[in-house]
UniProtKB/Swiss-Prot annotation:
This is Peroxidase. Binds 2 calcium ions per subunit. Pfam families: peroxidase (PF00141). It is an enzyme of class 1 (oxidoreductase). One of its GO terms (molecular function) is metal ion binding. Removal of H(2)O(2), oxidation of toxic reductants, biosynthesis and degradation of lignin, suberization, auxin catabolism, response to environmental stresses such as wounding, pathogen attack and oxidative stress. These functions might be dependent on each isozyme/isoform in each plant tissue. Keywords: Calcium, Glycoprotein, Heme, Hydrogen peroxide, Iron, Metal-binding, Oxidoreductase, Peroxidase. PROSITE patterns: PEROXIDASE_4. GO terms for biological process: hydrogen peroxide catabolic process; response to oxidative stress. Belongs to the peroxidase family. Classical plant (class III) peroxidase subfamily. The lineage of its organism: Eukaryota, Viridiplantae, Streptophyta, Embryophyta, Tracheophyta. Residues 56-80 are annotated as: Disordered. Glycans are attached at residue 70. It comes from Triticum aestivum (Wheat).
Amino acid sequence: ALRGFGVIDSIKTQIEAICNQTVSCADILTVAARDSVVALGGPSWTVPLGRRDSIDANEAEANSDLPGFNSSRSELEAAF
């Protein structure tokens, strides 16, 4: 296991106590990465927050909504 995931889990638990199912682990990792860069003297940037993923997995939706592994470049560009 990678070090530091306990810290992320702790942060997520504390945030979910205030605003459940709003902030994702991806949000926390992104903000932590940005803040680490700033702490080391690097640039800052705005991080858009808010859960945009689902709170449960749906294989049928994933198979129909996500591009396939063999999609062409034009198909990938059109999907996004």
